[in-house]
Amino acid sequence: MTLDIPFDNTYAQLAPEFYTRQAPTPVKAPRLLAFNDALATLLGIARGTDAELAQVFGGNELPEGADPLAQLYAGHQFGTYNPQLGDGRAVLLGEVVGTDGLRRDIQLKGSGPTPYSRRGDGRAWLGPVLREYVVSEAMHALGIPTTRALAAVETGETVWREGGLPGAVLTRVASSHLRVGTFQIFAARGNTEALRSLTEYAIARHYPEAKGALGLLRAVRDAQVELVSAWMSVGFIHGVMNTDNSSIAGETIDYGPCAFMDVYHPNRVFSSIDRTGRYAYGNQPQIAVWNLAQLATALIQLEDDPESVLEEATEIVHAMPELLEDAWLRRFRAKIGLREVAEGDLELVSDLLGIMAQGQADFTNTFRGLLDGTARDQFLEPEAFDVWESRWKDRLSREADPEALMARSNPVLIPRNHRIEQMIAAAVGGDYASFERLMDALSHPFEAREDYADLRRPPAEDEVVQATFCGT
C-alpha cells in the first residue's frame, strides 16, 4: 500500500515550457532517517510505516496523484546572469492544501538527474540534507518564513564529491518554488505569453490582493523586507542570495552554505564560493534590493511600452532600502527592549553593534545577555560596553515591561555552525543522537533549558567553522 498524500496540483497544469516532467530516480536501499510528524499532520498526510515513508520520500514509489516535474528557471549567480538553470537535482512531486487552507509544494531534493542537471549526478549527500533539515526547522521555530523539511531518507548509495559520501534525499515543503529567476528566464527569452501566465499564477497563489505585475512587484518587495530584516535580527547569513534563490513567496530557500554568526562583524562571510564578500551579513539588505530590481526588469516586459511603467517600477524598488532600514530598526529596537519610538534609538542600536564588532562579542549571547545580565561577559574589553549599558538603561527606564519584549525577540539557541558540523560528522558515522538532540533543542529556541546549556556556548578556538560549502 502506497502512502496517501492528498495532492492537488496546479503548477503541472501550466504550459509545458515551465517544466519538464521527470520522475525521481529510484535508490538502492532507502532508509528513513527523520520524519516531521507535525508538518505531515498540517499537510493532511497520514503517517505510514517507516518502510513506506522511505520508499516514497526516497523516490522509489510515486504516491497516487503525484505529477513529478523539474522546474525551469534562470538566475543571476554572484551578479552574472546564467540564462538557464532549473531543478538539476530535485523534482516537485506535487502540491497539497493543508489543514490550514494554505497550498504548499512537496519536493524531493537529491532525487536524481533531470534535463537541467548540467552534467551533475542529481544526487545529494547526507551532510547538506541534515543541515537543511535542522536549519530550516530551526528557522521555522524562530518565526522566520522558510521552506520546511518533511523527511530525510538515506539512499544506501555512495555519492562522489571530494570522496565517497553517503547519499540522502530531503523532502522540502515550500509555499511554492517560484523564484525571481523563474520570471527572468521568460523575460530574457522575450516570451511575454509565458511571463504573463506566470505572473497571473503567482498573484493568484500568493498575493491575490495584488493588482497586476507592479502589484506583484510591490508584494514581493514587502515580503522580502520582512524576511531579510528577520535574517539580520538573528545573525543569519544566507550565503548565496542569487536571484534563483530569491523566493517570490518571501521564504528562506536553499540552505547550502548558510551560517549563523558567532562573533559579530558586519562583513562576515562563510560561503566558500563568496570570494568577494558579495553576500556578507551586512550586504544582505542591498542584495535584496538588487534582486528586486531584476524582478522589476522582468515584469515591465509585460507592457507593450515598458518605458510607460518604468517610473512606477523604479519607485517601488527605490522605496525598498528605507523600508528595510525601518524593519531592521524595529526588530533591533525590540531586541534591546524598546517599544516606544524615540530620537536616538538608531544611534543606540548602531553603537552597540559597533562595540560588539570591536569587542569580538558573540551576537546571540550578547543580545540574550542584555536580558539575563551576562552581556558584559561577551566582550574582550568590556569598558566600552559599560558606557553603552549606562545609556541603554537610562533609555529603558521609559519603557513598560521591556523584559517580555526582549525574551521573545532574542533566542537562547541558534543552530551554531560547529554544532551542525559535529552533528553531520556523527551521522556519517551512523550516530544520530546529536541530530535528534539538536532538533529537540532548536524547536524551542527562546527557552533557557539547563540540559541544553552547552548548545549556547560559542565554539572553542579549535571548533570555529571558517567556511561553509554548498555540498552539491
Swiss-Prot record:
<keyword id="KW-0460">Magnesium</keyword>
<feature type="binding site">
    <location>
        <position position="122"/>
    </location>
    <ligand>
        <name>ATP</name>
    </ligand>
</feature>
<dbReference type="GO" id="GO:0000287">
    <property type="term" value="F:magnesium ion binding"/>
</dbReference>
<feature type="binding site">
    <location>
        <position position="245"/>
    </location>
    <ligand>
        <name>Mg(2+)</name>
    </ligand>
</feature>
<comment type="function">
    <text>Nucleotidyltransferase involved in the post-translational modification of proteins. It can catalyze the addition of adenosine monophosphate (AMP) or uridine monophosphate (UMP) to a protein, resulting in modifications known as AMPylation and UMPylation.</text>
</comment>
<protein>
    <recommendedName>
        <fullName>Protein nucleotidyltransferase YdiU</fullName>
        <ecNumber>2.7.7.-</ecNumber>
        <ecNumber>2.7.7.108</ecNumber>
    </recommendedName>
</protein>
<feature type="binding site">
    <location>
        <position position="88"/>
    </location>
    <ligand>
        <name>ATP</name>
    </ligand>
</feature>
<keyword id="KW-0547">Nucleotide-binding</keyword>
<keyword id="KW-0067">ATP-binding</keyword>
<keyword id="KW-0464">Manganese</keyword>
<dbReference type="GO" id="GO:0005524">
    <property type="term" value="F:ATP binding"/>
</dbReference>
<feature type="binding site">
    <location>
        <position position="254"/>
    </location>
    <ligand>
        <name>ATP</name>
    </ligand>
</feature>
<feature type="binding site">
    <location>
        <position position="89"/>
    </location>
    <ligand>
        <name>ATP</name>
    </ligand>
</feature>
<feature type="binding site">
    <location>
        <position position="121"/>
    </location>
    <ligand>
        <name>ATP</name>
    </ligand>
</feature>
<feature type="binding site">
    <location>
        <position position="254"/>
    </location>
    <ligand>
        <name>Mg(2+)</name>
    </ligand>
</feature>
<keyword id="KW-0479">Metal-binding</keyword>
<dbReference type="Pfam" id="PF02696">
    <property type="entry name" value="SelO"/>
</dbReference>
<feature type="active site" description="Proton acceptor">
    <location>
        <position position="244"/>
    </location>
</feature>
<feature type="binding site">
    <location>
        <position position="172"/>
    </location>
    <ligand>
        <name>ATP</name>
    </ligand>
</feature>
<dbReference type="GO" id="GO:0070733">
    <property type="term" value="F:AMPylase activity"/>
</dbReference>
<feature type="binding site">
    <location>
        <position position="86"/>
    </location>
    <ligand>
        <name>ATP</name>
    </ligand>
</feature>
<keyword id="KW-0808">Transferase</keyword>
<dbReference type="InterPro" id="IPR003846">
    <property type="entry name" value="SelO"/>
</dbReference>
<feature type="binding site">
    <location>
        <position position="179"/>
    </location>
    <ligand>
        <name>ATP</name>
    </ligand>
</feature>
<keyword id="KW-0548">Nucleotidyltransferase</keyword>
<comment type="similarity">
    <text>Belongs to the SELO family.</text>
</comment>
<feature type="binding site">
    <location>
        <position position="109"/>
    </location>
    <ligand>
        <name>ATP</name>
    </ligand>
</feature>
